[in-house]
């Protein structure tokens, strides 16, 4: 049976963050953006322990058989949450939503990786979908903009779902095997609320990965290209003797008891 794989877009394939910073500089001025960046760097030094404690709490909730605490979902990337006030965020998003076909202006985070994904999916008969919670902007719908962007980057006929709910429930409803995301809370949703396995694309320092991540069976890779290497190995003919999730566990260095039943 072919792999059924879902890819998040922003932070995994598309560089939304850089474009939002650019738009923030247009809106507020570069000096203010630089001050906010300095403030964010100071906060980073004091929030690492808090993040780890939150990860431990999430682990305990799952171990006790309780669902993980719900997180507030919005459309603001984590980096800008640290840098901007709520009022500034709202003003930025109002500005972005007025830009015609904004989602087609983004750069590819890793040039060529989308075309590589398309080639691998075609050769290996993977069923690939793309998940996003992008808000609407002027111009075409967020779905159509995203489809055109993916096609321009080398992925023909992309299946794009603009969704707001739990990634885990979506994975369960679509009977997905693997979900790739750059948000730890989305990966947690996947492993708690579905039978799918989650791979976290974590571009920051490894020491800042939430403590609960690996204990809950979430694989961690540094880049999307690394993720494609792992998927290739999972799907390789030399690994067919073992089960899919055993292959995921082995290739991502997870302990056997770390994968939820």
Question: What do the PLM-derived regions correspond to, one by one?
Answer:
Residues 90-91, 97-130, 138-144:
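Short, acidic loop-to-helix structural element flanking the phosphoryl-transfer center
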Residues 160-163, 217-226:
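Short acidic-hydrophobic, aromatic-tinged amphipathic segments that line or gate anion-handling sites
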Residues 179-219:
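Acidic, Mg2+-coordinating phosphoryl-transfer loop and its flanking beta/alpha structural elements
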């Amino acid at each position: 049976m072919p792999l059924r794989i879902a890819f998040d877009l922003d932070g995994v394939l598309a560089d939304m963050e850089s474009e939002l910073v650019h738009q923030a500089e247009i809106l507020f001025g570069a000096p203010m953006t630089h001050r906010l960046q300095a403030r964010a760097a100071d906060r980073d030094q004091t929030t690492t322990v808090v993040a780890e404690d939150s990860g431990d709490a999430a682990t305990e909730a799952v171990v006790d058989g309780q669902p993980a605490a719900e997180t507030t979902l919005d459309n603001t990337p984590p980096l800008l949450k640290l840098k901007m006030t709520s009022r500034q965020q709202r003003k930025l998003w109002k500005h972005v939503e007025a830009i015609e076909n904004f989602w087609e202006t983004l750069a590819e985070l890793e040039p060529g990786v989308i075309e590589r994904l398309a080639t691998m999916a075609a050769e290996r008969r993977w069923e690939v979908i793309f998940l996003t919670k992008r808000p609407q902007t002027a111009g075409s719908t967020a779905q159509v903009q995203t489809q055109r962007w993916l096609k321009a980057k080398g992925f023909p006929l992309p299946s794009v779902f603009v969704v707001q709910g739990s990634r885990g429930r979506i994975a369960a409803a679509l009977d997905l095997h693997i979900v790739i995301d750059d948000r730890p809370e989305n990966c947690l949703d996947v492993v708690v609320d579905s039978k799918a396995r989650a791979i976290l694309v974590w571009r920051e320092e490894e020491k800042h990965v939430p403590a609960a991540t690996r204990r809950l069976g979430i694989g961690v890779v540094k880049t999307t290209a690394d993720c494609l290497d792992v998927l290739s190995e999972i799907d390789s003919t030399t690994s067919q003797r073992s089960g899919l999730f055993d292959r995921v566990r082995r290739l991502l260095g997870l302990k056997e008891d770390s994968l939820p039943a």
